[in-house]
């Protein structure tokens, strides 16, 4: 693994919405120190385990990702996501979006897509109680 700089996460990497970064930077409950090497090693290790494991089969899965996510780049997460791909898998990669896709400038579009996906895979209440 390449050397990890001893710097905190830049709020600019989270979203194209400047308010998201400002809120992150001013939140006293957010850890603002550098990312620990062990955390990153565990993340990469988890991606590798998922990439070798079983998929989700028929479990409905929606993967949303920002095309410009520098914290979890597509090329790093792609092997695990491809392994999880199952019968009801849908992928939405948003051009220009960064790490916090649900807090992006097009958040309404993203939330609408999540709601649409949930509606498409939800079991009606009457069928669920049978």
What are these regions (language model features)?
Residues 35, 73-76, 106-107:
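Residues at alpha-helix caps and immediate loop-helix transition turns in enzyme cores, especially N-
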Residues 59, 73-83:
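Short alpha-helix in the alpha/beta-hydrolase fold that links the catalytic acid
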Residues 35-53:
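Active-site nucleophile elbow and catalytic-triad environment of alpha/beta-hydrolase enzymes
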Residues 88-130:
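Catalytic active-site module of serine/aspartate enzymes centered on a nucleophile-bearing elbow/loop
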């Amino acid at each position: 693994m390449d050397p990890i700089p001893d710097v905190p996460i830049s709020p600019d990497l989270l979203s194209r919405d400047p308010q998201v970064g400002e809120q992150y930077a001013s939140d006293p409950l957010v850890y603002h120190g550098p990312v620990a090497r062990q955390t990153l090693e565990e993340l990469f290790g988890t991606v590798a385990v998922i990439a070798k494991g079983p998929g989700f089969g028929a479990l409905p899965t929606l993967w949303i990702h920002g095309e410009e996510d520098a914290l979890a780049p597509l090329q790093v997460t792609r092997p695990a996501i491809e392994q999880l791909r199952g019968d009801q898998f849908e992928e939405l990669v948003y051009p220009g979006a960064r790490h916090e896709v649900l807090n992006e400038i097009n958040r309404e579009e993203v939330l609408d897509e999540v709601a649409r996906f949930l509606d498409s895979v939800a079991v009606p209440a009457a069928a669920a109680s049978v």
